Structure formats: structure tokens, C-alpha cells
């Protein structure tokens, strides 16, 4: 085989479509749509450079979404779980309803760490896209400045038909969200500046319930993050002092959505006419992603520990 023919064969292999082993019993069915996350990560050890990857997290199954396996209990799992991920994927990378790039990534033979399960190595010479500058806002449990994670999909389904955008809650909606927060945390304990190690009951006020972020859609749905200010205790905060998210229906019904997370992006990733929302899990010794769909009535969770 000539060198030119070899190069052509390599090019065909490199840009091949998704290599994906379907679960038993579904061979011959339509290939699922996959959602991954283009990540920026600090090196595993001091002095190691940052690295980029695409973490394979969700796939369509029937009329819903399911997560890929993620939470390995032991080292043996790390050596075998890679077989449950697609061998190679061509990704369309998106942000805010627009395509921002394309990458190709491959699953390694095994994963070395619990926190790297699902991470594929980016191949090729094209630099993966970035949005903005590195920030600790995206660093999660490790707390180092990294580039914003971006949603990657195997189909060009990146548009956001519901047009989710930052917003300000009305006075009435803010009051309803605060009522829901207080219903979730009727009793809170706190420390004092004079004693940061011992807690006692703390009658927090409305002003302590800060609406930190809020987003709205053209279908008149809202989501809001509430953070309780005024915590004085030393060490990891109690649940009430962590990020709490609520969803508000067009009828102004408020429901708890989740905690210790932040919104990565929204898009109609399965092309059903409605947007899915992807959140990043940001908790102590815990990371991953949550995908909400069907008007927040259903979700899929990809979750891992760091040690």
C-alpha cells in the first residue's frame, strides 16, 4: 500500500461516524443521540498541565434520556467500565443555541481515576473551542480555574427553541420561591462570629434568602437559584447554606429542582421541539451532570466521586 493510500485510510478511520456498541437486545435499532461535555481539567498531579476531554454522559433511550454508567465502586470497575462507552464519537459542540465547534474523541482502554469515568481523549489537530476565560466558577470540587464546560452532541440538535435566558424574578415570584425555600428548610442552625464551631437555632429572614440566579423561557417557565446568606460556621456548610434550585411553572407553582449545581446550557438535544437543560453538579467530593426534560418532570443523572 502506498503512503498516500495509507493516509487516506487513516483519514477515513479518523473521521468515521460514531462507533457505538448498543446494549444487548437493541441491535439494529436507530442509533441513540449522545450528549457529552467538553471539559477543561487540571492535571492529576502537581505540575501536570491542564487537559481537555469530552465526557460521555447521556444518551436517548425510547422517549427519554438515560445516563451512562458513572459511579465506580472500586478499581476493578475502572478497568472494565470503558467497554460500556462508545469507542469513538464525532461531536458537535454548542453553546447558547449555537454551534461553536466540532471535535472527535476516543474512549481509552480503561479509566485511571474515579473522577475520569466517561472521559474520552480528544484526537486530531483541531483545537477544541473555548468560551470566555478560565474561572473558578467552573472548577467544581477541585476549585481550580478552568474553561467553561460546553455541551457536545452527536446530532446537530443544538438550537434552544425555548430560548432560556437570564432574568430577574418579579416581587411576587421571589416571595413564592422564598416560601418554597422556607418550606424545605423550616429550621436552620448557624454559628456566630464569636463561636464558629457550635451551632444553635437561627431564625433567618427573607433578606437572607438571596435569589442568586434566575432564567426564563419563552414558554414562561422559570428556574431560580437561592442561596442562604449569613452563614458563620467553620468548615463545609450545612445543606441550607448551599445552592438550592427551584422551578416555577407558568401557573406560578414552585417545585424544588436540586441542590449543589449550576446551569451549563439548554438545547433541544433530542429534536423533540422542547429544550433540555443540563446542570453541572458542584458538591463536596462529588461531580457530574444532570439533564432535565419533559418540563422538569424527568431527569437523568451522571455522577461520580473524586476519591
Predicted stretch roles:
Residues 1-2, 18:
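Low-complexity intrinsically disordered segments
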Residues 2-12:
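Bacterial N-terminal signal peptides that target proteins for export
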Residues 12-22:
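Bacterial N-terminal signal peptides
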Residues 23-28:
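Sec/Tat signal peptide C-region and signal peptidase I cleavage site
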Residues 29-307:
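Beta-propeller-forming repeat regions
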